[in-house]
Amino acid sequence: MQCLAAALKDETNMSGGGEQADILPANYVVKDRWKVLKKIGGGGFGEIYEAMDLLTRENVALKVESAQQPKQVLKMEVAVLKKLQGKDHVCRFIGCGRNEKFNYVVMQLQGRNLADLRRSQPRGTFTLSTTLRLGKQILESIEAIHSVGFLHRDIKPSNFAMGRLPSTYRKCYMLDFGLARQYTNTTGDVRPPRNVAGFRGTVRYASVNAHKNREMGRHDDLWSLFYMLVEFAVGQLPWRKIKDKEQVGMIKEKYEHRMLLKHMPSEFHLFLDHIASLDYFTKPDYQLIMSVFENSMKERGIAENEAFDWEKAGTDALLSTSTSTPPQQNTRQTAAMFGVVNVTPVPGDLLRENTEDVLQGEHLSDQENAPPILPGRPSEGLGPSPHLVPHPGGPEAEVWEETDVNRNKLRINIGKSPCVEEEQSRGMGVPSSPVRAPPDSPTTPVRSLRYRRVNSPESERLSTADGRVELPERRSRMDLPGSPSRQACSSQPAQMLSVDTGHADRQASGRMDVSASVEQEALSNAFRSVPLAEEEDFDSKEWVIIDKETELKDFPPGAEPSTSGTTDEEPEELRPLPEEGEERRRLGAEPTVRPRGRSMQALAEEDLQHLPPQPLPPQLSQGDGRSETSQPPTPGSPSHSPLHSGPRPRRRESDPTGPQRQVFSVAPPFEVNGLPRAVPLSLPYQDFKRDLSDYRERARLLNRVRRVGFSHMLLTTPQVPLAPVQPQANGKEEEEEEEEDEEEEEEDEEEEEEEEEEEEEEEEEEEEEEEAAAAVALGEVLGPRSGSSSEGSERSTDRSQEGAPSTLLADDQKESRGRASMADGDLEPEEGSKTLVLVSPGDMKKSPVTAELAPDPDLGTLAALTPQHERPQPTGSQLDVSEPGTLSSVLKSEPKPPGPGAGLGAGTVTTGVGGVAVTSSPFTKVERTFVHIAEKTHLNVMSSGGQALRSEEFSAGGELGLELASDGGAVEEGARAPLENGLALSGLNGAEIEGSALSGAPRETPSEMATNSLPNGPALADGPAPVSPLEPSPEKVATISPRRHAMPGSRPRSRIPVLLSEEDTGSEPSGSLSAKERWSKRARPQQDLARLVMEKRQGRLLLRLASGASSSSSEEQRRASETLSGTGSEEDTPASEPAAALPRKSGRAAATRSRIPRPIGLRMPMPVAAQQPASRSHGAAPALDTAITSRLQLQTPPGSATAADLRPKQPPGRGLGPGRAQAGARPPAPRSPRLPASTSAARNASASPRSQSLSRRESPSPSHQARPGVPPPRGVPPARAQPDGTPSPGGSKKGPRGKLQAQRATTKGRAGGAEGRAGAR
């Protein structure tokens, strides 16, 4: 069990977070005998501490579980441990006890676990010499536990650890008996098997019987040993990358196991034949198997006293737990940690069943088992029930959150330098190379593994087989500390007990915190967040259920079979979003996880629909580049958005993990997206496309993201609101995270490792994409995706996962945003603001990147993202300070591709709304964005004037422009812009605002900032009135409400204010707060200006809306409502379209006319957003009354039905929940507050699928975009149809202006994406 101590390190984090960061504080003395030195691990079941025995002065492992835990595993642990005392390979039992707060077991402390040691090997494999000698010891330990009437049921590398003392360092100890079961009755006879038994064990190593939920027998432990030894020698198992328990079970059942013996000694055929012939009742011939090992050793001349591989490598098993653990913390490779995680809590019944069955006479009473109770500790008096709840659920939740935050922080660090760390820790320095073979340093192979994602399956297989696989696995589990699987696994005490240096490492990486919060989340999520990895780790029924529900969701046909990750991610979702640290963590995690979305594209949506009710686990692999994104979700379906948002920044952070990313990043997602976007891709193709785009985008995103990693994380999170896409991405990322968790936790990890490696490559690509996407995709990192940015993002999420990283990001962000707004009001502000930041730079750049500007957006996006930390400050000022020439030139030049103008407009909006984004954007891009914003009023009015005007012409657009001006840096420009071109400027600002709206949070952020009150931001979300700085804001807010809020419904407002104001500014002090402060500083000065500008604009807009733009404004509002999330997209559409070909005058002249079609065109880039905006526009056009109403709503004073609708919805959107539905509903809001809701449902249903299906089509090419929407682009009827759920009109309209729309859609993409997500929901 001392081994457990190491393993417990992680476990402790996993479960410790439940009650508090730690159940026991340092220096706490248990029973006046054991003084806590430090936590070395944690899991769902509890925490493992290294303690000093004050009587013997020796260091021991102290395994603690909260008395309030539903799953009490220590009882079984104690029962089995006591029965095994005196046997070889079993930790010495020192004492146990319980009090009202916790149960504890004290045992001998052990060293590193075998999973960690294998990963520490350069090839991730053990030599035959080490494999055979370990096999002998493990076989002896299995025979020993069987001899006392128990089955271990979770035989895996992380549950075996080497001793840490000179006398025991060459002895292997069995750990973690939390899943054990008594297979004999009191008379010693074999108990009759149950017809159906829950799955127990770890997926990778589980026997076929276990997969079939049959009663496990002695032979099943030997099957696990067989798989273990093959993995030791070969480095991986064929199902390593598959997380789905059912899929792995099918593979194992059909797989010709003799194929596994190719690299094994010929004698192993006897081993295989023998275990294959056994049944539940038959006693295995242990001696026959032992002879196989011995004969193989004789043949090869292997001596019993040869040095083990890690001894040769200098990785000393003697290393103290703490020594070995630190590397694990950073690397997630600690097998023990994995084991701890794997200890995943078994469902209460199962645990109870095990404990009750095993020993009803065994009690954790201090009097019986521990040294005499010292009178000095009455408080520790043993309570009659071990289930006493020491900490109330509330404190537990707080603790979980705390752990989450800590984990996030740790992860963030990991994310930033995980690659390097991994590489360095490996000693091979395999930073970007997919090869996983060189984990030189046993402790830190994990990161490396991550990077060792190998594109070629063989390469992955080899490297992974060597142990790299385990590293990623370890990493992924570690990365997913908050993942339910981890929590669940942690529940099993035995694994926790393993003393794995890896645990400490994992802990260091923050996994412990994650696991702690994960467990909490898992509990709250009913283990929906429990990842398959957890399932692999432990066989809880919940796991199985989750596997099917969440994992299978994640596995659409054609999608990669990495379902486990999804579940893993979910735990983070479960994690409360409110905490800043947590949010950050989520931010970091989300980007990471999303990449997984690729394989889960189709799934993602499906998942989204399913997930909305259940928050995706925050991507636990935040430390991981990929998993990172999934870290912070708030429980709840919309909380997915927080998950997405939180993870995204983390992804950014994991960017450093992106050496590979960089490599993969070579292919810009735009180009890939451009085509793939237009062409509906089969999931596999999409994945391929996404990979390509991921590679390109990652390359530039990598740099950009690396710099912006943290800020991006902070800033990006807000975009998360679009939950729908995220779920898809999440599904994939979750899978990855799950994978990672599993890998981390154990060989499951290895199995996942391959998956992880592949997915890691993909994920890293995706991570890069997402980071770029988060940064840029927020503003539509990918040009092609940008085309379908908002909706494309959503579609992209399925597809984006395949080919549009930025879309994925944007989508995810949007989805996150939408979802966050709906479900996670708290998360949303952060996400919103992050989204904002990301959007402006990314949007500007990325959207322009559609085709021609891809490189520019790349640079801009990279720079933009990079500066996000460094330059979030400049937001407003940067906008103004930026070189106008640059921006104008960019605008002028970029408008060619719809993206640039739209993108810039969107970017500007983001900048204005979210200066952070602008600041974040690289000065090239950022300057452009700022200049763009500043000049946008000028140049945009002129160069993008047509676009801007059109956008503005859309009443929502114009109003948005007003808000934008008042909100962000655009304010100053906005002041003149309205003067020069009330409409044009408005259009430009509108475009910007649209971008803002797209960003949702960004827009709110600026307005929030402008308002200079987070509450105001929320107020904005709630209603236009609250935004005093944006006097026009009410109107604008109304507009935003219809667009932004209408789209997400209740979350629209939430998108902007909640994200930035509540979450972004408050939750993310470093990124959000700084952003907010900057916003406030800039926004305040600009607020007056903004107010003036907005008032002027308002007047102008009202007049214009009343006059020529009445229908358009109506449409725009409706579209805005529909777009809510994709607000930016409608505005973007008009702005970008006009920018391309229409001058301001043209835009104005065609304001009414272009407004409708353009929004649709823009919508096209974002199918959902486009469709919704289109529907809005169409609906608005047919109903001038609606337009007028819309205008009034925009004005806020007149906002009769729409205004009222918007306002009520704004607060909800802001709050969360039905944000998407409401968002969907909102779009029709101008027409009718209620119709929008139903419409949103219909539209969401149709839009989300469409957005996904059209994402590529529409995004890449206008024609495609146009095609999807057959209805006339400017036809009002289609617009209405769309609100009803027919997104085609929007799509078709977008189609013609695919480019402009794409770029503007980039901005819009976010909004649209959110909208699409809402639809998907």
From Swiss-Prot:
GO terms for cellular component: cytoplasm; cytosol; microtubule associated complex; neuronal cell body; nucleoplasm; nucleus; perinuclear region of cytoplasm. SMART domains: S_TKc (SM00220). Residues 458-478, 540-554, 573-588, 792-801 have a biased composition (Basic and acidic residues). The modification Phosphoserine is found at residues 441, 540. Residues 484-495, 874-891, 1187-1199 have a biased composition (Polar residues). Divalent metal cations. Mg(2+) or, to a lesser extent, Mn(2+), but not Ca(2+) or Zn(2+). Residues 733-772 have a biased composition (Acidic residues). Its EC number is 2.7.11.1. Keywords: ATP-binding, Coiled coil, Cytoplasm, Kinase, Nucleotide-binding, Phosphoprotein, Serine/threonine-protein kinase, Transferase. PROSITE patterns: PROTEIN_KINASE_ATP, PROTEIN_KINASE_DOM. Residues 685-781 form a coiled coil. ATP binds at residues 40-48, 63. It comes from the Eukaryota. Residues 363-397, 416-677, 714-908, 997-1092, 1104-1321 are annotated as: Disordered. It is found in: Cytoplasm. One of its GO terms (molecular function) is ATP binding. The keyword Cytoplasm applies. Serine/threonine kinase which is able to phosphorylate TAU on serine, threonine and tyrosine residues. Induces aggregation of TAU. This is Tau-tubulin kinase 1. It comes from Homo sapiens. The lineage of its organism: Eukaryota, Metazoa, Chordata, Craniata, Vertebrata.
